[in-house]
């Protein structure tokens, strides 16, 4: 699922036009150019009651859209939402937006803007 999600986001022109290949699981590399995306698995569990048969899992994936300005972060979040909401393909049985929030990330040194979205990802495990 992780590989498929990252590859899909990098392949969508509306997303890659803003971040190129700057889509990373966990944390962005030190000194990462903005804008960029980080992806985090918040939870992941098998779905035992699936009509799709064994091997279906459901993950909550947090997608953080980082940018130098709020407008850039919001534009990136809209591109990601358009790409991911209701997407299915390959191992991904379905992806759906669960929540979104705007969060500043002010460490006192640099001002970075962030829009965070949680997606429910149903996928075929294994």
Please place each PLM-identified region on the residue numbering.
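Small/polar-rich, solvent-exposed N-terminal microdomains that initiate assembly or binding
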Residues: 1-53, 71, 75, 82, ...
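Residues in well-ordered beta-strands of folded domains
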Residues: 24-26, 38-40, 64, 98, ...
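Short beta-strand or tight-loop elements
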Residues: 35, 59, 101-102
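Oligomerization/assembly interface segments of phage tail-like spikes and tubes
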Residues: 55-68, 73, 113-123
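Acidic-leaning, charged glycine-interspersed low-complexity segments
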Residues: 82-126
